[in-house]
Amino acid sequence: MARISTSSNRPVPTSSALRRQRERDDGGRSTRAPGHNTGLYGNQPGDPPTIRSTNTTVKRRYRPGTKALREIRRYQRSSELLIRKLPFARLVKEVAENYIGADYGIRWQSNAVLALQEACEAFLVHLLEDTNLCAIHAKRVTIMQKDIQLARRIRGNI
């Protein structure tokens, strides 16, 4: 035979007692402040879910080094030049003008400037690879000026 529970000896709470209990649980405020949503999807636990507007974008937060590794992989896959062509061409022309003199008026073929740029970028990439190895050898991950100096000294072109 099933047992039927009888009413307990606790009194039934009145509406004023319920209101006092709700204020106590609510921290003293009976109505929620607008914009103070803390539940799932920005709502209080009893509220119906609302749809967030589509124009609010949350900025993605990556762990330290994740974006750097992604950039390294992207640049290792690609074969395009990393230095912009026109600033490099201006630099080459300025250095040649300072070295030879402005009165000669040297002209440059675009292929000659492009060949110089390819050689410069290959040199810099190789130097930075050696510099990174020097930093790793020193149990560091950050390259420093002394790593570049050591790499150039070991290579023999100071």
Swiss-Prot record:
**Gene Ontology annotations for the cellular component aspect, listed alphabetically:** chromosome, centromeric region; nucleosome; nucleus
User: A Pfam family in this protein?
Assistant: Histone
Q: Where is the composition biased (Polar residues)?
A: 1-18
Is Ubl conjugation among the key words of this record?
yes
Q: Where is the composition biased (Basic and acidic residues)?
A: 20-29
InterPro entries, alphabetized: Histone-fold, Histone_H2A/H2B/H3, Histone_H3/CENP-A
Q: How is it modified after translation?
A: Ubiquitinated. Is degraded through ubiquitin-mediated proteolysis when not protected by its association to the kinetochore.
List where in the cell it is found: Nucleus; Chromosome, Centromere
- Would you indicate the residue range of the signal peptide? none
| Disordered as annotated region, ranges | 1-59
The region called H3-like is annotated at 54-157
The UniProt entry, under PROSITE patterns, shows: HISTONE_H3_2 (PS00959)
Chief location category: nucleus
Which keywords does UniProt give here?
A: Centromere, Chromosome, DNA-binding, Nucleosome core, Nucleus, Ubl conjugation
Instruction: Identify a single GO molecular function assigned to this protein.
Output: structural constituent of chromatin
Q: Does the keyword Repressor apply?
A: no
Q: What PANTHER family does this protein's entry cite? A: HISTONE H3-LIKE CENTROMERIC PROTEIN A, HISTONE H3.2
Complex formation: Component of centromeric nucleosomes, where DNA is wrapped around a histone octamer core. The octamer contains two molecules each of H2A, H2B, CSE4/CENPA and H4 assembled in one CSE4-H4 heterotetramer and two H2A-H2B heterodimers. Interacts with the inner kinetochore.
Give the family this protein belongs to, as stated in its UniProt record: Belongs to the histone H3 family.
Protein's job: Histone H3-like nucleosomal protein that is specifically found in centromeric nucleosomes. Replaces conventional H3 in the nucleosome core of centromeric chromatin that serves as an assembly site for the inner kinetochore. Required for recruitment and assembly of kinetochore proteins, mitotic progression and chromosome segregation. May serve as an epigenetic mark that propagates centromere identity through replication and cell division.
Task: Report what the protein is called.
Answer: Histone H3-like centromeric protein CSE4
Query: Which species is this record about?
Result: Millerozyma farinosa
